[in-house]
Amino acid sequence: MALESLKEVARKIAGSSSIDKKFVEEMVKEIQRALIKADVNVRQVKEISDAIKKRALSEDVLPALNAKEQILKIVYEELLRGVGEGLEIPLKKAKIMLVGLQGSGKTTTTAKMAKYFKDRGMKVAVVAADTWRPAAYEQLRQLAEEYGITFYGEKGEKDAVKIVKNALEKLKDHDMIIIDTAGRHALEDELIDEMIKIAEVARPDYKLLVLDAAIGQLASKQAQAFHEAIGINGIIITKFDGTAKGGGALSAARQIGIPIAFIGTGEKVEDFERFDPAGFVSRLLGMGDIKALMEKIERIASEEELDPEAFLKGTFTLKDIYKQIEAMNKMGPVRKIFEMLPFGLGLKVDNDVMEMTQEKMKKFRVIMDSMTEEELLNPKIIDSSRIRRIAIGSGTSPQEVKELLNYYKTMKNLMKKMKKNKLPIKGLGKLGF
């Protein structure tokens, strides 16, 4: 992922024995390398690195901090200044128009955004106004059906403006209407004319440009062209997890002064989040994003109507994992949870646990169905002979049973660490931890 190496910079600062001029200069070089590798605009790289170096060598250490904490604070603040502002779309009635080039992930983003707002209590509808790509109508219809979202489209209709006009009439009772428009390989006149006409008819509250993170610094040229055409007021960066060039899209947004509204960090519907600059930079440095984690937990706990008592009483068994496994599926891979915790709380976790999938979670349920009540309540008694019996009974292998036990131990250790570090873990109790 873009800017991943910044975590190593933060670790070196936190683990350094002394902070001197030589250390600062080397640290700044590493930050420069990380930013350039992520395709951040060279001018912006110089601005950020110069500011960090100047402040690190000249500012007095604040009374409440030590030298390492002061340096981390400076790096954090200057990177935060570098990523620019975020755009928070409030939970109220609004029309949103998505634009972008072909292949940017616009249609998928339309559905993900609709699900995002639906999960937060809004009545949402999506409009299929991409009449150029034959598969766009069916793709959006299927995604809307999967996520339980109102869909409007007119199969075979070539007039996108007419579709939008009819949709607005039919969807008046919805809180949010999200319009998916046509994408192109380039900004052709015909596309620009259609976008302008749709914007005139829809009068959207938000015109959001969808940018593929993989295009790097080319994002700046695209963003400027769309902005001049219809006046975009927000950006969504997609596929941020799958490229080393995501910094280019971030710097493009800052260059033209357009805030980032959302970022897509994976293929799943839950891999879509509001862009919070402070939390984003904090995660880049491996310092976590507790606020985002708590928000996610509170929402999922509310959806699942989970009882926090088990964890709050200090108990955590395999039975708790069984009951709350669906909620964990919604949280996403363990890796994504750890990214929201400061330096992963120092826990060493196997890759197979980090990349826990829904398929694996389902298999865990089958394994637990073959356990006795005593084993579920007291996993410590599960020895090698019990593991063999459980594997045979569940139609799995002893290795898979061990994976479940390893996952259980990891999550239990995580909770202990969070309690020890006095992190706000009450919300985690709602997931049965």
Curated annotation (Swiss-Prot):
Signal sequence region: none
Compartments where found: Cytoplasm
Q: Which UniProt keywords apply?
A: Cytoplasm, GTP-binding, Hydrolase, Nucleotide-binding, Ribonucleoprotein, RNA-binding, Signal recognition particle
UniProt record, GO biological process: SRP-dependent cotranslational protein targeting to membrane
Q: Which InterPro entries does this chain map to? A: AAA+_ATPase, P-loop_NTPase, Signal_recog_part_SRP54_M_sf, Signal_recog_particl_SRP54_hlx, Signal_recog_particle_SRP54_M, SRP/SRP_N, SRP54, SRP54_GTPase_dom
GO-annotated cellular components: signal recognition particle
Q: What GO molecular functions are on record for this protein?
A: 7S RNA binding; ATP hydrolysis activity; GTP binding; GTPase activity
The UniProt subunit note reads as follows: Part of the signal recognition particle protein translocation system, which is composed of SRP and FtsY. Archaeal SRP consists of a 7S RNA molecule of 300 nucleotides and two protein subunits: SRP54 and SRP19.
List the HAMAP family: SRP54
In its UniProt entry, what is this protein called? Signal recognition particle 54 kDa protein
Look up and give the organism this protein is from. Answer: Archaeoglobus fulgidus (strain ATCC 49558 / DSM 4304 / JCM 9628 / NBRC 100126 / VC-16)
Q: Which gene encodes it?
A: srp54
